[in-house]
Amino acid sequence: MKIKSFLVSNLLFLFISLSFTQTGKVYDNLSMQSKILNSERKYAIYLPPDYGSSERRYPVLYLLHGSGDDQTGWIQFGEVLSIADKSVANSTATPMIIVMPDANTGRRGYFNDIKGEWRYEDFFFQEFLPFIEKTYRIKGEKRFRAIAGLSMGGGGSFMYALHHPELFSSACPLSASVGPLSLDEAKKRYRNENKDINDAELENYYNQHNALSLISTLSVDQLKSVRWFIDCGDDDFLYEGNDLVHIALRKKEIPHEYRVRDGSHSWTYWRASLPEVLEFISDAFHQH
């Protein structure tokens, strides 16, 4: 009887230990075919620890990489697997699916180009997002969908949430490129590769791809429909733009979180930001 009790106790301990060490999974070389971009598009995905053992649907975070990286950046350098698993285990974040698209193949960036020849943003909203939310068990409603990203991807998360506030409950730009800070700067930047673009076309493109311009034109209700978390290091070369966005949101009395911590434009900074991002967006997932 003592031997039997000993075996039962050990099996129970082993079962409990295994349940606590259950981890999520990442896949970093997945792909889909895009008609809009006429190419195969790579993406990576994090599935939470209980995804394979349940039939439930999950909230989703679209997590955008920066310039020079691809869909593997947040996995290799951002340590998304260990950070997300730890946040879920600590109950600071809800189990969620994290999707990381590649925006570095063909042309770099998350937007349509000024001539409309490379339509990445159209691809994202018309093909990629519907494909992901059909392929995986995702709660496909605004309140269960968030977007975040770093640097170029921070700019993408700003613009996507400002272009489509009806789709995202939270937006978390980290060290974001907010777009040219003036029309003159935009002319210098865009004219280098688009010398035949007239002033009206250029100004319209600038207004649609500049966070400050979009904040000034969107209604208060539209801006308030998204929960904003903005984070940028005090030594980051993109600090000025993020600070101006913070001021613009304050002037319109838009609730938002603004973090300025000691740090620069680095993975060390972004890895430290990610747990707070996951907690912030989880609050939005839970508030309903």
Regions found by a protein language model. Give the residues of each.
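Positively charged n-region of N-terminal signal peptides that target proteins for export
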Residues: M1-S5
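General helical structural elements
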Residues: F6-V8, I45
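Bacterial N-terminal signal peptides
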Residues: S9-S17
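Non-catalytic cap/lid and distal C-terminal segments of serine-dependent acyl enzymes
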Residues: Q22-H288
